[in-house]
C-alpha cells in the first residue's frame, strides 16, 4: 500500500556502485514513500549476475529504513532460478518478490505454462509474490482471466501492471 517507486542500480564504470545505491535509498527514506522496488526493469536486473544481485539485495536492505517496504525483482527464465532468487530475497529481508513472466520461449508461454511457472514460484517463495506484467519487455501479456486465477493463490498478493492499458486493468480489478 502506498507509493513504491523503482530504484535504479547505480554503476561506476562497469562495476556496481553499492555506496551510491545505499546513499540514494537513505535520501529516499526521508520522503513519504512507502518503500522501493529494486532489481526490477529500472534496476537492470536482466543484466546482472547472481552474485551482483545478492550484493544489491544486501545493500538495499541495509540502507532501507525498517518502516519501508522492500520489493525485489526475482523473476527469471527458469522456475528454479526464480524460486532460488525469491528465497535469497527473503534471506536479505525483502517484503515481496516481484516475478516477471519468463519470455525467452514466448511461443510456449501459454496460459497453462505461465500458471505452472508462477504457481510454483509462489508455492516455494517464503515471501509474498507480486506478479509483474511488463509486455513491453517480455512480449507476453498476462490476461485478466489468468491474473484472476493466480490471485486465488494465498501467496500471490498483487500485481505490478505496466501495460498502460486501463481497460485491461479495469478487467483485472473486476475479476
Locate each region found by the language model.
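Active-site beta->alpha loop and helix N-cap motifs at the rims of alpha/beta catalytic domains
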Residues: 1-141, 147
Amino acid at each position: 500500500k502506498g507509493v513504491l517507486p523503482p530504484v535504479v542500480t547505480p554503476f561506476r564504470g562497469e562495476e556496481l556502485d553499492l555506496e551510491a545505491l545505499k546513499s540514494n535509498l537513505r535520501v529516499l527514506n526521508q520522503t513519504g514513500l512507502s518503500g522501493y522496488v529494486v532489481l526490477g526493469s529500472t534496476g537492470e536486473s536482466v543484466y546482472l549476475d547472481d552474485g551482483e544481485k545478492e550484493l544489491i539485495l544486501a545493500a538495499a536492505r541495509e540502507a532501507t529504513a525498517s518502516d519501508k517496504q522492500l520489493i525485489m525483482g526475482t523473476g527469471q527464465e527458469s522456475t528454479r532460478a526464480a524460486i532460488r532468487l525469491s528465497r535469497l530475497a527473503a534471506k536479505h529481508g525483502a517484503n515481496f518478490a516481484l516475478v516477471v513472466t519468463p519470455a525467452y520461449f514466448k511461443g510456449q508461454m501459454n496460459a497453462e505454462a505461465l500458471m505452472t511457472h508462477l504457481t510454483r514460484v509462489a508455492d516455494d517463495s517464503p515471501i509474498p509474490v507480486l506478479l509483474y506484467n511488463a509486455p513491453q519487455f517480455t512480449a507476453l501479456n498476462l490476461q485478466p482471466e489468468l491474473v484472476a486465477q493466480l490471485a486465488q493463490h494465498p501467496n500471490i498478493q498483487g500485481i505490478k501492471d505496466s501495460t498502460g492499458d486501463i481497460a485491461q486493468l479495469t478487467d483485472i480489478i473486476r475479476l
